[in-house]
Curated annotation (Swiss-Prot):
Region entry Disordered, spans: 216-237, 454-488
Comp. bias (Polar residues): 222-237
Gene3D superfamilies named in the record: L1 transposable element, trimerization domain, Nemo cc2-lz domain - 1d5 darpin complex
Species in which this protein is naturally found: Danio rerio
Family annotation (CDD domains): UBAN
UniProt-recorded name of the protein: Optineurin
Annotated PROSITE patterns: ZF_CCHC_NOA
Electron transport as UniProt keyword: no
Cellular component terms (Gene Ontology): autophagosome; cytoplasm; Golgi apparatus; nucleus; perinuclear region of cytoplasm; recycling endosome
Parts forming coiled coils: 15-127, 174-453
ZnF segments: CCHC NOA-type: 487-517
InterPro entries: CC2-LZ_dom (IPR032419), NEMO_N (IPR021063), NEMO_ZF (IPR034735), Optineurin/NFkB_EssMod (IPR051301)
Length: 517
């Protein structure tokens, strides 16, 4: 009897070994599940960090594109203003050329008339002087010849001056014709000064001759008084009167010549002032022409810069579009992985109480596929990083960006503010992540407490049935055939140690864990 009763207990170590293996498998499954959860968590965090990095890089590229567009707009406005200023300067130059040519033409005609008038007066003075010299018998033909020759030279000079502007006005450009007219005016000023000096010399000579004539008259008077008779005295007196009249006339002519000299000096001063004004106008025109050339060169440079900026902006837009497409693909992959992760979490929550080998294999295959997908995405991300690195190198090699390196240094403070903003956003996301972690840990604790509560409820539900564990073995005095029949009719959900019959497999597993402990 005792041997038959102890026989079912003797078969306990084999069942105990299978139970330990089951517990070990369950522990390994739980551990692998935790590892899988941790790996998914880490991949989620890494994907989130990479997504944040890509978002920050996208914001930076957007700021740079906005800055380049702003610079392009400024360059366009500056080009428009420069074009307007260029047109205004062209109109001013045309007006100045037109007014300057008209003024120079009128002044040239006036100077020609004055030179001809002065020349005629000089010829009259020379003729009068020669006539006086012939009358007095003291004339110097060499001097008169020199004066006439000088007058002829003046005529030639005036003719040259009148012919040169006409030839230059038609042959030379406007700027060169203005310079030529200034030079001609300077030559005319020099001729006027020479003429003034000659007139002063002629005045001095005339005064000297008048003094000689007066001395000769006095000598003639004295000689006439001593040697000649009364008739000769009368002739001498008449001759003296004639000479005095001639002297008075000559003095008047000298006064008129002095007045003309004063007029010539005033005209000379006016011409000098006009020459100074023309030189100043010429200098201003030259400076305006230089400024115009500089503005034109700056316009050309700005056009070249604008074309290069437009090409760079087009290239940057194309790159940003490609990066946007890649980012959208990454977002789709991330959402898909997140959905897979959420499905795995839900399935884990559903099957956490009873994990079978098939489920474990399925989880393992899904985990392998998830790891493979993550590896593929990581490879794609690395390739994108390499492409981004290459694109950054290409961007650095652009000459326009190198030329604007100094401008970028002025944007340091704006970039620092953007970085501070990004740092604040990261801190905010970190706080949100901590909050999510806390919620996750709370949910896990609630799940564990719920599992323990359900396990305790199941234990409490099944303990009253096993309150009399010796019930099936109570009839110890039964014959051996009856014991063997009972051993053969043991139900499937009976405890191998104590023989307690349980309604289902879950209750049996919980009871076995409690009974073994």
């Amino acid at each position: 009897m005792n041997g038959d009763i102890s026989h079912p207990r003797g078969s306990g170590p084999g069942n105990l070994g299978s139970l330990e293996e089951t517990l070990q498998q369950m522990n390994t499954l739980i551990k692998e599940n935790r590892d899988l959860k941790e790996a998914l968590k880490q991949t989620n965090l890494s994907m989130k960090e990479r997504f944040e990095g890509l978002s920050a890089w996208k914001e930076k590229q957007k700021e740079e594109r906005d800055f380049l567009e702003q610079r392009l707009e400024e360059a366009r406005t500056r080009l428009n203003t420069m074009d307007v200023e260029n047109e205004a300067l062209k109109n001013q130059v045309k007006e100045l050329e037109k007014s300057g040519a008209e003024c120079l033409h009128t002044e040239l005609e006036a100077l020609r008339g004055q030179i001809l008038r002065i020349q005629a007066e000089k010829n009259d003075l020379v003729a009068m002087n020669s006539e006086l010299q012939l009358k007095m018998g003291q004339g110097s033909p060499s001097n008169s010849f020199i004066e006439i020759r000088i007058a002829d030279d003046d005529l030639k000079v005036t003719k040259d001056l009148s012919s040169v502007p006409e030839a230059s006005a038609f042959s030379m450009p406007k700027a060169e014709s203005e310079e030529q007219t200034v030079r001609q005016l300077l030559r005319s000023l020099r001729a006027e000064t020479d003429e003034k000096e000659r007139l002063q010399l002629t005045l001095q000579e005339a005064r000297g001759r008048i003094a000689e004539l007066e001395s000769k008259l006095e000598h003639a008077d004295s000689s006439a008084q001593t040697s000649l008779p009364s008739a000769a005295e009368t002739n001498a007196s008449t001759e003296v009167k004639n000479l005095e009249d001639q002297l008075l006339k000559l003095c008047n002519e000298l006064k008129q010549a002095q007045i003309k000299l004063d007029e010539a000096e005033s005209m000379k001063r006016n011409l000098q002032d006009r020459c100074k004004d023309l030189e100043q106008d010429l200098g201003t025109l030259k400076t305006q022409l230089g400024d115009k050339q500089k503005v034109q060169a700056e316009n050309d440079c700005l056009k070249v810069q604008m074309e290069s900026l437009q090409a760079a902006i087009k290239l940057e837009q194309k790159k940003t579009q490609d990066e946007k497409n890649n980012l959208n693909q990454l977002k789709d992959a991330y959402t898909k992985l997140f959905e897979d992760y959420s499905e795995l979490q839900e399935e884990k929550k559903k099957r956490e109480s009873c994990v079978s080998k098939d489920d474990y294999d399925e989880l393992q295959t899904r985990f392998a596929t998830a790891e493979k997908a993550l590896a593929d995405k990581q490879q794609k991300i690395d390739e994108m990083k390499m492409e981004l690195f290459q694109k950054e190198k290409d961007l650095e090699t652009i000459s326009v960006f190198q030329a604007q390196a100094e401008i970028y240094s002025s944007d340091f403070y704006a970039e620092r503010a953007a970085r501070e903003k990004i740092h604040e956003e990261k801190e905010r996301l970190a706080t949100q992540l901590e909050y999510v972690k806390k919620q996750n840990s709370q949910l896990q604790e609630e799940m564990e407490s719920l599992g323990r509560h359900s396990m305790s409820e199941m234990q409490r539900r099944h303990v009253p049935r096993g309150a009399n564990p010796q019930g099936p073995t109570a009839p110890n005095n039964l014959p051996g055939g009856r014991g063997e029949w009972q051993q053969q009719n043991i139900p499937d959900h009976a405890c191998p140690k104590c023989g307690e019959v349980l309604p289902d497999l879950d209750s049996l597993q919980i009871h076995i864990m409690d009974c073994i402990i």
